[in-house]
């Protein structure tokens, strides 16, 4: 099934987890996150996308969720994400970018992304991309991981604010 999907779409299947909720909200029970992270670890054939407005909670909550199974911790008890976990932060303004992107970059993840919806003002993302330079990388070596993907959009409907 997964091979057929990849052959047709050229990518792995993705699960946009809790798209109408926030896994890292303080009201979400820790036990629920433990079960969720166990499921993520047991489904390496799927890419799991977690988008949050509370990126400041993510690193601590992920570590706590993984400590009980021991599935995702290194020998020195540091959180290590599964290869199929993507973490994203909602950013709508430069102030949010300045505050939250460093928190996103400090959260271990296979991939990191921004959801800039609705984009309510200009945001400078200079310096946050992977820098590919064939002369400075050995084959198979990746430069420092930064932001892998950006989703940009505006609002719709009556009274929608313009996108910048």
Predicted regions span which residues?
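Conserved AdoMet/S-adenosylmethionine-binding subsite of the radical SAM
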Residues: 1-164
């Amino acid at each position: 099934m997964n091979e057929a999907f990849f052959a047709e779409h050229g990518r792995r299947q993705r699960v946009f987890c809790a798209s109408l909720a926030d896994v890292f909200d303080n009201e979400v029970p820790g036990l629920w996150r433990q079960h969720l992270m166990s499921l993520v670890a047991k489904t390496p054939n799927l890419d799991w996308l977690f988008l949050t407005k509370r990126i400041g909670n993510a690193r601590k909550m992920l570590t706590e969720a993984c400590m009980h199974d021991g599935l995702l911790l290194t020998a020195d008890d540091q959180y290590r994400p599964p290869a199929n976990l993507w973490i994203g932060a909602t950013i709508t303004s430069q102030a949010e970018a300045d505050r939250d992107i460093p928190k996103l970059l400090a959260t271990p993840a296979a991939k990191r992304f921004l959801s800039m919806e609705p984009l309510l003002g200009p945001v400078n993302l200079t310096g946050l991309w992977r820098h590919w330079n064939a002369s400075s990388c050995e084959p198979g070596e990746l430069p420092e991981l930064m932001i892998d993907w950006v989703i940009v959009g505006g609002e719709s409907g009556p009274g929608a604010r313009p996108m910048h």
